[in-house]
Amino acid sequence: DAPVASAFVYNKIEQGAFYTWAYDANTMWDGGTTTIYKSGTTVEWDNGKAPAINNSFGDTTGDSFSYTAGPYVGTVEFTLYGDQDAAYLAFQNGEVDFVLNPLGVKRNLFDQLSRVPGVETVSNLGNGMRYMAFNTRVFPGSDKSFRQAVACISDKEFVLNNILQGVAVNMDGQMPEALTAWVAPVTGVLADCAGLNAEERFNKSVEILQAGGWTASDWGSHAGGAERAVAPTGIKGPGGQTPPSDMLLYAPGAGYDPLRSTMSLFIADWMQQLGLDVTARPTGFNVIVDKVFTPENCEDWYFYMLG
């Protein structure tokens, strides 16, 4: 009985398996005509079953095209799959007609689908973003120099281009870079660390920690090239505070979102190279939400990735 804004109503659900929509014979969305212009729209809907609509918006002159809503199938069945691989395998086998997936597909899966007879693939940038959050209520996330050091050593461009094969683009803020009139130039630590190689990023991150009052028994070193850094030992924050052990970076698993899953592994490793005991933990999306957004848990986590 839930209200819907479409020509269908919820029909039945089998938990963990499927749910169905049934066509609503009294819908207002059947038979109406919509005309699209360059800078305007005209809507003329009067099917005798719902209040008539006849409205125009914007500039309704010049070239246009029209389409009529409907007819609709009687029932739509949504089969529920646990991950992308299972869903797209069903698609390739003809078991489902389309896949609803707001997260995009992995590059190898995209290439695989492009080779399926009768399937045409189109690639465009997703309208979304992924982010990593520090818990600024607790140490070490509460320390600005720590956050800046992690931002510096994290070579996002390397992961995006070399590991994820360019399926996403780097963002240094929440405003899409295409909106050039609104995006301020990158400054500060992000600008200072842009374009640095792995050795330079490590050394710069250590400098940031030292300038922020961090100390270490041995600050470690980086041999250059693709080698991992020899991590600092005995590292302590300002005032001699020892970072916690067994800190977790929560991120959705690879079956749900391979982009965040992959990035979390690299960022956790970079934090380890700075002497922090951090592990990437694949976790269900809703589990992460419950863990980090409830007041009673507000100090029980250190890092997470969502979007």
Predicted regions and their residues:
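Conserved acidic residues
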Residues: G74, D97, D300-Y302
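Periplasmic binding protein-like
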Residues: L248, Q272-G307
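Alpha-helical scaffolding within the catalytic cores
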Residues: P117, V230, V289-F293
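Extracellular/periplasmic catalytic domains that process cell-envelope and extracellular macromolecules
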Residues: K12-Q15, Y67-Y72, S114-R115, L125-N127, ...
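Short amphipathic alpha-helical segments
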Residues: Y72-V76, R130-M132, S245-M247
